């Protein structure tokens, strides 16, 4: 019988113990807790307490419209005994002025750890949203129509603002994430990022919205870019897309050392982030990944990207 998505899935005792041990020191680089403009099933405090109880090392709050670093600072001050480290970043959508170097500079000064290129306001995302096959989460109340954003100018070259953002990311030694830009944009983005000294790079859900081919994934990994696969797409719930066999294939394309698994959870109709981790760990164990391989993908790689290891 399938476990309801809002409940904790129960595994045999030996598997439960195995999963619990693997969860210790996990890192979630993509937690969609609230408050948010779109409905969320838990808030930042609840996500923090869940992660703390499971023994996570770090949690990164992602919102499409605001930098969450102030929430992190206040929660850490109010709960000084927390072991899980709390971080956030900024998504360069219309709410922060788009591809805005001033917003990025501010985010870095507030200890932001990730700069996501445009997500919901990316031209690619808007184009994909027009397709009947897509079912993106929407805001609880109508918002202003998004102004489509791209990192490329009319001649197909990176814009000056994008280059300035890359320089700031390199100087801050934080993570550049491709957001919802199309793969064709991300190729140029990461090539320029490397040339400008960016060392930590991430492609978010490469096979969803981004339209990466298997060869694109191999190519990005060879450049030193990590592939971040969204757990929500491999566990039961609203975001489910593929089973364990496909996840194993995708991991094989980039390799263990260039793969990160993050929840991308908090959306309605799906498990909570920590529960998503539990379920995907069960899948990885069923796929015969070793404990060392799993820890690399859910902990070690994320700690390195956050400069915690």
Tell me the role of every PLM-derived stretch.
Residues 1-84:
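An N-terminally biased module of ancient metal coordination in phosphate/nucleic-acid-related enzymes
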Residues 83, 94-203:
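Extended substrate/RNA-proximal surfaces in nucleic-acid metabolism proteins
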Residues 167, 172-241, 260:
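Catalytic pocket-lining loop regions of alpha/beta-barrel enzymes
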Residues 256-273:
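Short acidic/histidine-rich active-site segments
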Residues 276-309:
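Mid-to-C-terminal alpha-helical segments outside catalytic/metal-binding sites
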């Amino acid at each position: 019988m399938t476990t309801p998505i809002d409940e904790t899935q129960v595994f045999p005792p030996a598997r439960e113990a195995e999963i619990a041990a693997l969860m210790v020191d996990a890192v979630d680089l993509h937690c969609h807790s609230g408050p948010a403009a779109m409905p969320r099933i838990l808030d930042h405090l609840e996500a923090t307490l869940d992660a703390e109880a499971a023994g996570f090392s770090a949690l990164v709050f992602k919102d499409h419209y605001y930098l969450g670093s102030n929430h992190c600072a206040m929660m850490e001050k109010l709960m000084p005994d927390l072991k899980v480290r709390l971080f956030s970043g900024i998504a360069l959508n219309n709410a922060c002025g788009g591809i805005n170097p001033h917003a990025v500079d501010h985010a870095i000064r507030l200890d932001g750890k990730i700069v996501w290129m445009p997500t919901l306001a990316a031209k690619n995302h808007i184009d994909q949203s027009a397709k009947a096959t897509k079912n993106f989460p929407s805001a609880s109340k109508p918002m202003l129509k998004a102004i489509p954003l791209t990192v490329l100018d009319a001649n197909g070259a990176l814009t000056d603002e994008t280059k300035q953002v890359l320089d700031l990311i390199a100087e801050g030694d934080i993570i550049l994430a491709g957001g919802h830009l199309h793969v064709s944009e991300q190729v140029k983005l990461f090539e320029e990022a490397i040339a400008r000294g960016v060392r930590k790079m991430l492609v978010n859900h490469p096979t969803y919205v981004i339209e990466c081919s298997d060869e694109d994934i191999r190519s990005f990994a060879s450049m030193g870019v990590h592939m971040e696969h969204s757990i929500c797409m491999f566990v039961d719930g609203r975001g489910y897309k593929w089973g364990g066999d496909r996840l194993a294939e995708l991991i094989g394309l980039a390799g263990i050392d260039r793969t990160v698994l993050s929840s991308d959870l908090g959306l309605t109709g799906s498990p909570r982030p920590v529960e998503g981790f539990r379920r995907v760990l069960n899948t990885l164990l069923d796929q015969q990944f070793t404990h060392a391989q799993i820890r690399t993908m859910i902990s070690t790689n994320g700690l390195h990207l956050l400069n915690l290891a």
